[in-house]
Amino acid sequence: MAGPFSRLLSARPGLRLLALAGAGSLAAGFLLRPEPVRAASERRRLYPPSAEYPDLRKHNNCMASHLTPAVYARLCDKTTPTGWTLDQCIQTGVDNPGHPFIKTVGMVAGDEETYEVFADLFDPVIQERHNGYDPRTMKHTTDLDASKIRSGYFDERYVLSSRVRTGRSIRGLSLPPACTRAERREVERVVVDALSGLKGDLAGRYYRLSEMTEAEQQQLIDDHFLFDKPVSPLLTAAGMARDWPDARGIWHNNEKSFLIWVNEEDHTRVISMEKGGNMKRVFERFCRGLKEVERLIQERGWEFMWNERLGYILTCPSNLGTGLRAGVHIKLPLLSKDSRFPKILENLRLQKRGTGGVDTAATGGVFDISNLDRLGKSEVELVQLVIDGVNYLIDCERRLERGQDIRIPTPVIHTKH
């Protein structure tokens, strides 16, 4: 169980104020940090919102599409209970206009309350990014029953590896763009303590980045087990690389088939992976491991951030809901050269990345293919969508090998909840 001062550090903001009443002026000054927030607010009042509104005329991201001068004026002086502001939410999207053909989200959350305090901007961004899901009227569903999956065994002449991942955030602690060093270390302590309770094929150990040699780190990165220091401007502009590698690390079981990343883009990333095409087995391990991790977290007096509108709360709005990305490394040397490939992926609600993941190129016709959506569909629905979609891509590749024509599939319809 977390100690009294640790729980004080991570209490929900409303409770934190009450708890601090008897904690002394030093603790109050350290934990609440009111002066910088007040000073920033006073500086903004010297100028009207119109003078502070960012120049977004050349931007191609979801934030820029929905942040009108009126919305900015309405939200710019608001803060969450921990002091997170609208300008901090949008700074990464202001600094990174985006690619003409790739529309990014362009904003991040600093804590759980961000999505409520700045809902006038986040809700339309979420609706655009998640295929029409309206968080004002719809509810998200969770389903981790792997027995519902149909098929799930890919032809391994095409599929090289299978993987399912998600993220989870510890309630009461700021998200990575906003967390202090103490909060980040508290996330690590809470998570590692819980993971020590995993048994059987899930049992393993934790490795701190700060205690690894460069050779050990690089080997884990090359094997696609470990995250590297963020270099993407989208992440660095959001403040997610601060104090690197303090309180970051990886936990994995003995077989390296179940992994937890700690304090990368989110508090945790939970990953099930293996070589080959047995997606059903990967998802079964994922569901079993994730349920056990949540049980161990709750057993120690903590819980994950979640609500019925947005599902599981994570740093980037693109990962809300399930936070789930089910993907494969797949060889598509012919289909990838076909002009219809992007439209096929779009209609199947799939996205492609390079062989090494986001911001990398494809090598030898090998792509990382995964689900595009996270919110509004359950985990089971998304994994089944990937299974059906990847099988369609394999069928297209086979047809092209035989010199036959392929067709663009009917678009996947978004299920309303």
Curated annotation (Swiss-Prot):
Residues 158-400 form the Phosphagen kinase C-terminal domain. Exists as an octamer composed of four MTCK homodimers. Mitochondrial creatine kinase binds cardiolipin. The keyword Transit peptide applies. This is Creatine kinase U-type, mitochondrial. Belongs to the ATP:guanido phosphotransferase family. CDD domains: creatine_kinase_like. It catalyses: creatine + ATP = N-phosphocreatine + ADP + H(+). The modification Phosphothreonine is found at T213, T355. SUPFAM superfamilies: Glutamine synthetase/guanido kinase (SSF55931), Guanido kinase N-terminal domain (SSF48034).
